[in-house]
Amino acid sequence: MAKIRVYELAKELNISSKELITLLEEEFSVEVKNHMSAIEDEDANLIKELLSGKEKSEKTKEEDDEIETTAKNPIKESTNNKKPNKRDDKNEKVNTENAEDMAIITITSETITVKEISDKLEKSYAEVIKELMLMGVMASVNQEINFEMAEKLAAKFDTEILREDEDEEDDLEDILRDNEEEEYLQKRSPIITVMGHVDHGKTSLLDAIRKSKVTSTEAGGITQHIGAYTVELNGEAITFLDTPGHAAFTAMRARGAQVTDIVILVVAADDGIMPQTQEAISHCKAANVPLIVAINKIDRPGANIDKVKQELTEYGLVAEDWGGDTICVPVSAHTKEGIDDLLEMILLSSEILELKANPNRKAKGTVVEAKLDKGRGPVATLLIQNGTLRVGDSIVVGSTYGRIRAMFNDKGRNIKSAGPSTPVEILGLSEVPEAGDKFYQVKEEKTARSIADKRKEKIRDEYLQSTHKVSLEDLYNQIQEGTVKELGLIVKADVQGSVEALKQSLEKLSTGEVKVRVIHGGVGAINETDVTLATASNGIILGFNVRPDNNAIIASEKDGVDIKTYRVIYDAIEDIKSAMLGMLEPEFKEVVIGTAEVRQVYKISSVGTIAGAYIQTGKLARNAGARVIRDGIVIFESELASLKRFKDDAKEVAQGYECGLSIEKFNDIKEGDIIECFIMEEIKKKTL
């Protein structure tokens, strides 16, 4: 059934949008959010009939009153034979026409540039600037004016300007509204989230279930990014989400709880309830998600299952064998004891929940992870929560969109379609989406682009300009002097999940004296654009597992922008916290002494991998620190194990020369890798 916007109907009826909204709510009990909301044609026709009926009755009454007045006061012949004023008639006619034919334009933000409003009004920049000057506003083409000023300006050109603040989610829900009656629903697999404290064995437990070694691929044995995996048990599929356990990734855990059906809370039998365990319990309760407690490491000396159950009661979780309704399963990821019992409990709980979805509708779900791949472009891991997603479908994801070019399952196999509760990796998006964004399948790419563009315009950042640069070393002094009221940070990381976690952790550091604000977060190497943004917004750049490119380094030195890079997320948080408290006392400074590009790779059985490299900048020195950078992301960090010039050992090799080198404990060197050589210089401590 066709629909009509409130403001369009108001224009037809020649009344204000506000009057129409009131009429809809009082006379028809139709609730609408604002002038941009859509109503059914049937309701619109009823309103037209009602108003036309009122107009007729009012008109009849007016005529009766006029006749009565005429009878009481007969018209006297005018002694003044003055002709009617044609100018007045003309003006009255023009005003009436303008009221009826006034053009309407919409904007989606609080501000708009002079250029944008000129284009919308279809007037030259000179005309618009002239009108602004007459209104006492001096503005150039690229300067912004607020909504109130834009409204007054539009009125000068017989145009009404409206603020479009509708939620696109409503539009999408309208687009996606399919039949969800019982006959269309089918049983779907449960989505399981594994939560718990650091090192309590979450990933090891998943390894035991999947019979694979994920932990060995993660730096330091700690899961850094969310992964989604599907396992088969007795012919039934179970989807697992592995959320990192350490405190800085609270946001990731919260995101996992929003899409999950059942949470497995892993608690070490020898450790008991820890801070992150408490947070996980809170997330589950807030999301109203069923909980199964896996008491892990029961093979360890000092394991005490009863102690864990006792601690759980303090948080309202009473084990079934203690008379409660919380399922507790003792397991050992190491010996695989209790794994089968745990899986049986998952399937039993999912049967009770009666999980269903409609595979024959348009797909929708959530982004689990997203990153930028040099060869494949934006790559996103999606969890389909309803409907079926196919290769070739158009989707809108947050403020980005795309048409699916390829789709892979959790095992890396190319697939053509995927149904509810299935995690997939897709290619074809225009940009890297935010982890946790909702995705929706739409009819065509044009619709997806339109919705994404609206969202981009809506969330466009307005950056504050400042002249004084901030660095971590002098941040405390500037806070004390009152120079800094807001600390702007640009966060770059290797994957979107890390960006999100860093943003949330850093913004929590805000105090009464200074507010910490992440003005931008993105995936990939630190580039010149990031430095430009930091310059304009008086910010500091933080990199997690990424490095600045050459242009960024040159620009940062020129503009005095502070760039800090980290491999451990807590170091970044502690540095900002210490700087704000005036406790930042740097003892060593990393100095990059040179970079080299790997041109050829040789594998020698007795030695390992030798790289033939060309020195691009500075020099390489033996025994100096070295990191391998691939596509702007730090792959490995160690030191140079050997450095040769031809067949001779060399202490150092200068810029413009070629050399052979090997990296300590690292053999996965590839052509095109950048070897960054650095030393740690001791510097004087600063008193802040």
Swiss-Prot record:
<dbReference type="InterPro" id="IPR053905">
    <property type="entry name" value="EF-G-like_DII"/>
</dbReference>
<dbReference type="Pfam" id="PF11987">
    <property type="entry name" value="IF-2"/>
</dbReference>
<dbReference type="InterPro" id="IPR023115">
    <property type="entry name" value="TIF_IF2_dom3"/>
</dbReference>
<dbReference type="InterPro" id="IPR009000">
    <property type="entry name" value="Transl_B-barrel_sf"/>
</dbReference>
<feature type="domain" description="tr-type G">
    <location>
        <begin position="187"/>
        <end position="354"/>
    </location>
</feature>
<keyword id="KW-0963">Cytoplasm</keyword>
<keyword id="KW-0342">GTP-binding</keyword>
<dbReference type="Pfam" id="PF22042">
    <property type="entry name" value="EF-G_D2"/>
</dbReference>
<feature type="region of interest" description="G2">
    <location>
        <begin position="221"/>
        <end position="225"/>
    </location>
</feature>
<dbReference type="InterPro" id="IPR027417">
    <property type="entry name" value="P-loop_NTPase"/>
</dbReference>
<feature type="region of interest" description="G1">
    <location>
        <begin position="196"/>
        <end position="203"/>
    </location>
</feature>
<dbReference type="GO" id="GO:0005829">
    <property type="term" value="C:cytosol"/>
</dbReference>
<keyword id="KW-0547">Nucleotide-binding</keyword>
<feature type="binding site">
    <location>
        <begin position="196"/>
        <end position="203"/>
    </location>
    <ligand>
        <name>GTP</name>
    </ligand>
</feature>
<comment type="similarity">
    <text>Belongs to the TRAFAC class translation factor GTPase superfamily. Classic translation factor GTPase family. IF-2 subfamily.</text>
</comment>
<dbReference type="GO" id="GO:0003924">
    <property type="term" value="F:GTPase activity"/>
</dbReference>
<dbReference type="InterPro" id="IPR000178">
    <property type="entry name" value="TF_IF2_bacterial-like"/>
</dbReference>
<dbReference type="InterPro" id="IPR015760">
    <property type="entry name" value="TIF_IF2"/>
</dbReference>
<feature type="region of interest" description="G5">
    <location>
        <begin position="332"/>
        <end position="334"/>
    </location>
</feature>
<feature type="region of interest" description="Disordered">
    <location>
        <begin position="54"/>
        <end position="95"/>
    </location>
</feature>
<protein>
    <recommendedName>
        <fullName>Translation initiation factor IF-2</fullName>
    </recommendedName>
</protein>
<dbReference type="GO" id="GO:0005525">
    <property type="term" value="F:GTP binding"/>
</dbReference>
<dbReference type="InterPro" id="IPR005225">
    <property type="entry name" value="Small_GTP-bd"/>
</dbReference>
<dbReference type="InterPro" id="IPR044145">
    <property type="entry name" value="IF2_II"/>
</dbReference>
<keyword id="KW-0396">Initiation factor</keyword>
<dbReference type="InterPro" id="IPR006847">
    <property type="entry name" value="IF2_N"/>
</dbReference>
<dbReference type="GO" id="GO:0003743">
    <property type="term" value="F:translation initiation factor activity"/>
</dbReference>
<feature type="region of interest" description="G3">
    <location>
        <begin position="242"/>
        <end position="245"/>
    </location>
</feature>
<dbReference type="InterPro" id="IPR036925">
    <property type="entry name" value="TIF_IF2_dom3_sf"/>
</dbReference>
<feature type="compositionally biased region" description="Basic and acidic residues">
    <location>
        <begin position="86"/>
        <end position="95"/>
    </location>
</feature>
<feature type="binding site">
    <location>
        <begin position="296"/>
        <end position="299"/>
    </location>
    <ligand>
        <name>GTP</name>
    </ligand>
</feature>
<dbReference type="Pfam" id="PF04760">
    <property type="entry name" value="IF2_N"/>
</dbReference>
<feature type="binding site">
    <location>
        <begin position="242"/>
        <end position="246"/>
    </location>
    <ligand>
        <name>GTP</name>
    </ligand>
</feature>
<keyword id="KW-0648">Protein biosynthesis</keyword>
<dbReference type="Pfam" id="PF00009">
    <property type="entry name" value="GTP_EFTU"/>
</dbReference>
<comment type="function">
    <text>One of the essential components for the initiation of protein synthesis. Protects formylmethionyl-tRNA from spontaneous hydrolysis and promotes its binding to the 30S ribosomal subunits. Also involved in the hydrolysis of GTP during the formation of the 70S ribosomal complex.</text>
</comment>
<dbReference type="InterPro" id="IPR000795">
    <property type="entry name" value="T_Tr_GTP-bd_dom"/>
</dbReference>
<feature type="region of interest" description="G4">
    <location>
        <begin position="296"/>
        <end position="299"/>
    </location>
</feature>
